[in-house]
Amino acid sequence: MERIRKYADPPLLIAIALLLVIGVFMVASSSFTTGLTKYGDGTYFFKRHLIFLVVGLVAAGVCYVVPLKTFQRFAFPAWSLGMVLCAALYTSLGVNVNGATRWLLIPGTHIQFMPSDILKYASIFYTANLLVLHRGKRRKEGFLPIVTVIGLSVVIVMKEDFSSAMVIAISLLGMFFISGMNLAEFVSILSMGLAVMYFFVFRVPYRMKRLTSFLHPFDDIGNTDWQLANSLYAMGTGSIKGIGYFRSHEVFNRLPEAYNDFIFAVIGEEFGFIGTSIVIGLFALFVQRGFLTALKQKGLYEKLIATGIFLSIGFQAFFNMGVAAGILPVTGLTLPYISFGGTALVFVMAMSGILLRLSRKGESH
């Protein structure tokens, strides 16, 4: 264990590894029926998940060995690219899936990706750059440029991807807090956030309906509540021990995105309260070790990066599991490490490589 500690924090590494293993088994189970129905191959999604997992592991390895100064140098270009790609969602390149245009299609291919994933993590590095650059400065010198970046990052994706916008906002505000936010700045940001919420959510009827539908999950089962109602049914069916691996009933066209957005519900159905508790415990361990990793950093930049990464992944997991359990409105966010892989898994693995690097024992960053 001491030998491993030289390369990464063992509990953090174990939490990530176990979540990935759970993901492999659960994608195999939750996607089998859909793969067989759509493509005549029950292992279609499983095989693709393994490919993306391998790519993600390579990305994690690369990010683990690349010095943080390299990411610091390319933070602004990456953030700018993310902004441009998110803006491209409003063009013909944007792909509408389940009523939301969150995906971009690469011309000449069948490859789709969510540009918000690029912006989500690029924002962490660029905001960290600004917070370090303007350390000790306030208002016009430091406060306004930083808030502008946070605001632009959130607003550009909020129209089509409100849930990702919330993850970005929480992770960046967490970084701002760590850097020494005072009460006046907190009140200012809170006021601006409420104003944005008012114009983008409270004044848009269909968003308000989506935001509040979880309070009455069985009122409109044929429309907005279909996913949530079936998710709750799956969780309830699983009871304490679950009905068994590969025995889910909800994957038979009852629970849309069973291998993706609602894979936590399938875990609850097949492995019950015990299974979901294990997953929640592993994510709690991830957040706790991520927090400790951030605390032990000697440099402000490293502390901010670790904070942004563990908050982003941790809150995305919280939102996903909260939706499946019926305590949060439907978001469309995947469950990190576990949901069917794609570019989202690759990005999460890349960020995990950086977090593991920062967690190394005795390294001066």
Question: Could you describe each region identified by the protein language model?
Answer:
Residues 97-103, 112, 187-278, 298-305:
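Hydrophobic, glycine- and aromatic-enriched re-entrant/interface helices and adjoining loop segments
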Residues 76-83, 139-156, 162-202:
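Hydrophobic alpha-helical segments of polytopic membrane proteins
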Residues 1-14, 18-19, 25-159, 321-336, ...:
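Membrane-helix boundary/helix-loop-helix interface segments in multi-pass membrane proteins
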